[in-house]
Design a protein with these regions (language model features):
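Extracellular disulfide-bonded cysteine-rich modules/repeats
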Residues: 273-277
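Extracellular ligand-binding interfaces
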Residues: 20-99, 108-239
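Positively charged n-region of N-terminal signal peptides that target proteins for export
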Residues: 1-4, 286
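Residue-level detector of functionally pivotal "anchor" positions at catalytic/ligand-binding pockets or at interdomain
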Residues: 240-264
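Sec/Tat signal peptide C-region and signal peptidase I cleavage site
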Residues: 15-19
Length: 286
């Protein structure tokens, strides 16, 4: 009886990883020899799961994931594969999933041989406002380039900000948000954005995003400055709210899921009386 009870406990607390194979073989990818995976293969795919492309013989050239004649939403614009790498992964956003289920996926690029493609367990915190998520290492002037298609179909009048999430757990790093290099390309930096230990937030007030995204990508450049390198993890749109101004809250009415920061950008677990940033909004706790 004890053995049966122990087995039931193990089953109840163990997470079983799942994977769905999409394709397996040997395919030398070139711009004139792409690998196509039909839409039907993604029938059971879900937001937050990861798609993994396994490969060999990489030579430092680019890989691009396409759908319906353009870059797959939620993917990097410039993603290079090197000899010491054997797989790349992308995490499914809502925009990506819609494209996959309607049009499938095409693996493009050059200088590598695809051997397997599958999808499976990934992240569990990807919501409907996420346009890119993954893990991108920010060190010295590292630049994440996200395909413009990640923003397809967005009505910018519904949104007030873009949040750039990371694992930096500090605010003393450099961040530049750009649509192109050179004059007129910068949307904001650490001096104009709201910086917290969890994310940097770019206000869209006064920015015509539809017009500014007249290029093929959105770029996020970071320099670690005096701290350690860190992972960049998500780009999330923040919707406008019906009400405005400072909220008057008490601690007992604050959701335990909310993350509270003081005005210096430091995380506060048990906030006392005063002003705080709660889920991106300035609030007063009694």
């Amino acid at each position: 009886m004890k053995k049966v009870f122990l087995l039931l406990c193990l089953l109840a607390t163990t997470t079983i990883a799942t994977a769905t194979d999409l394709w397996e073989g040997t395919h030398a990818v070139d711009w004139s020899n792409t690998l196509t995976i039909e839409a039907a293969k993604f029938a059971d795919a879900q937001v937050g799961q990861k798609i993994v492309v396994e490969f060999k013989d990489a030579t430092g050239e680019v890989i691009e994931l396409h759908s319906n004649g353009g870059m797959l939403p939620g993917t990097r614009y410039a993603h290079f594969l090197y000899a010491d790498q054997h797989e790349m992964e992308v995490f499914i956003t809502p925009g990506m999933l819609a494209c996959l289920k309607e049009h499938g996926m095409e693996i493009c690029g050059k200088g590598f041989t695809a051997t397997k493609v599958w999808y499976g367990d990934g992240k569990d915190n990807v919501d409907g406002n996420t346009v890119w998520t993954g893990y991108f290492w920010m060190d010295e002037w590292s630049t994440l380039e996200v395909a413009k298609t990640s923003f397809d179909g967005i009505n910018w009048s519904d949104y007030k900000a873009i949040r750039f999430y990371s694992e930096a757990n500090r605010t003393d790093y450099v961040i530049n948000v750009l649509t192109k290099w050179g004059d007129g390309g910068k949307l904001g930096d650490q001096t104009t954005m709201t910086m917290t230990n969890e994310y940097a937030e770019l206000s869209l007030e006064g920015i015509d995003m539809a017009a500014r995204l007249d290029t093929d990508r959105l770029m996020v450049q970071c320099n670690k400055e005096g701290g350690n390198p860190f992972n960049f993890t998500a780009i999330v749109l923040v919707k406008k709210e019906v009400d405005t101004g400072v909220r008057d809250l008490t601690a007992r009415h604050t959701s335990t899921a909310s993350k509270n920061f003081n005005l210096a950008g430091q995380r506060v677990v048990n906030p006392g009386k005063g002003f705080y940033i709660v889920d991106g909004r300035k609030c007063f706790f009694k």
